[in-house]
Amino acid sequence: MKTSEELRLAPDSLPSDLVPAPVLQASPADKNTDSEPVPPPCGGDDQLQVATDAVASSVVSQELQQGDSAPLEVEFNISSELSPRIEEQEVPENASLPVEETNRPELESGEAMEGVSEEPAAVDEGDIFWSYSFSQVPQYLSGSWSEFSTRSENFLKGCKWAPDGSCILTNSADNVLRIYNLPPELYSESEQVDYAEMVPVLRMVEGDTIYDYCWYSLMSSTQPDTSYVASSSRENPIHIWDAFTGELRASFRAYNHLDELTAAHSLCFSPDGSQLFCGFNRTVRVFSTSRPGRDCEVRTTFAKKQGQSGIISCLAFSPAQPLYACGSYGRTLGLYAWDDGSPLALLGGHQGGITHLCFHPDGNLFFSGARKDAELLCWDLRQPGHLLWSLSREVTTNQRIYFDLDPSGQFLVSGNTSGVVSVWDISGAFSDCKQLEPVMTFLPQDDCTNGVSLHPTLPLLATASGQRMFPEPTNSGDEGEPELDLPLLSLRHAHPECQLQLWWCGGGPDPSNPDEDQDEKGQGRTEAVGMS
């Protein structure tokens, strides 16, 4: 789907009465890299059990002090060599994936580790940067539902905005990754806009269950050589997909001690884009993005009955310090040095296996969530092992339930098993471990909300819903009563609502008819469960 460069935003088409946002990049799927940038759319416990390494804790305490500590310098040695598209069967030794230029200045601990161009684009004085507001229930804009109704047992497994905000990526039970552009109606100058159903512009099919997926950390739609997606699926290599064409660009292979191909359970690109970190059983493997294939660095997390055991199920990098966090299905969190993987601290406190991690933009706090665990936990890196506070959410299954932070670090948003989306205001100082209550909750649909993603530049919240439905045994009728023509196992009480939805969170006028029942397309109904 191509977006015209001639379109301009009209304040009247916004869900709010605010003025237009700054310029937004074109979607990777648009393939028109010579065009001018497209304008943006208008529109609980007293004390949890914590296990820490005394020596490691002291080390990380010295390195991760308050903001007055000496900055840590990190030098990135990145290859600028670009690669052709590489077939999965044959990967030349000299093949490489594109990364940023080598003449990049050193970054200090207080700087965000993002791509730095030689000539930064000028910022128009008239540009306005949006901020999120949850003083009222978000307004529904558009969504996609027909795409996930072709199979009776299909459901979404999360959604992730691209780093530049040009498009959104989804995962689903049919083993297909889909990329959607922003709705074209957001560029309309009409006062009354009827949003059509969103249609994916790309579909990338994996061979089996997708374990994890992620965007390239320096992805920019203006640079096609940075627009790609990584995915890992059962009994398959790690695949790199072209976000412009949907073609396979490269593969990374990991092998166990029997020289058998093994699949990664979690993926995360380093902030500078030079490395791909992958989680395995008691191991993190680090691949160089400039050299696809099987060559990698193996970092063991558990040795001699010490360390972090279990499958490394999620990974996240600190935006301000040279370290990364690993969550495992063994219910532990580990902090490791970026350069050599040396352990810094080991934390515990969750009741189930860790499924998602997220660092605060300031780099001092990070959040963790687990399966079959009713709490999100917040940790302070300046005091390793100290739990800052907890946030309650309903997670009663083994499904991965995502949460996300807005770019300013003020709001944290999470779904839950019953479908309710909760929003917490985490700004301010919290010195004691306590329960933090949400400032607002709302119900997008009557099914599990497993994915939430906050747009990096616009007040747009994306939600993904659905869960696996297990059949229930049917009761045989009493003697003399007619028996229903139903199988012994039935899904007649299940009403799945599998859909991707976009919500405007810019603090505009109240949405019309908030209590109106949802129609067959899945749009219109938003139920406020509670607000403060």
From Swiss-Prot:
Pfam families: WD40 (PF00400). Its main location: nucleus. The keyword Cell membrane does not apply. One of its GO terms (cellular component) is Cajal body. The keyword Transcription does not apply. Keywords: Chaperone, Chromosome, DNA damage, DNA repair, Nucleus, Phosphoprotein, Repeat, RNA-binding, Telomere, WD repeat. The modification Phosphothreonine is found at T474. Transmembrane segments: none annotated. InterPro entries: SWT21/TCAB1_mRNA_Telomere, WD40/YVTN_repeat-like_dom_sf, WD40_repeat_dom_sf, WD40_rpt. It is found in: Nucleus, Cajal body; Chromosome, Telomere; Chromosome. Phosphorylated at Ser-61 by ATM in response to DNA damage, promoting its interaction with histone H2AX and localization to sites of DNA double-strand breaks. Coiled coil: none annotated. SMART domains: WD40. GO terms for molecular function: histone binding; identical protein binding; protein carrier chaperone; protein-containing complex binding; protein-folding chaperone binding; RNA binding; RNA folding chaperone; telomerase RNA binding. RNA chaperone that plays a key role in telomere maintenance and RNA localization to Cajal bodies. Specifically recognizes and binds the Cajal body box (CAB box) present in both small Cajal body RNAs (scaRNAs) and telomerase RNA template component (TERC). Essential component of the telomerase holoenzyme complex, a ribonucleoprotein complex essential for the replication of chromosome termini that elongates telomeres in most eukaryotes. In the telomerase holoenzyme complex, required to stimulate the catalytic activity of the complex. Component of the telomerase holoenzyme complex composed of one molecule of TERT, one molecule of WRAP53/TCAB1, two molecules of H/ACA ribonucleoprotein complex subunits DKC1, NOP10, NHP2 and GAR1, and a telomerase RNA template component (TERC). The telomerase holoenzyme complex is associated with TEP1, SMG6/EST1A and POT1. Interacts with the chaperonin-containing T-complex (TRiC) complex; which mediates the folding of WRAP53/TCAB1. Interacts with COIL. Interacts with SMN1. Interacts with RNF8. Interacts with histone H2AX. Belongs to the TCAB1 family. This is Telomerase Cajal body protein 1. It comes from Rattus norvegicus (Rat). The gene is Wrap53.
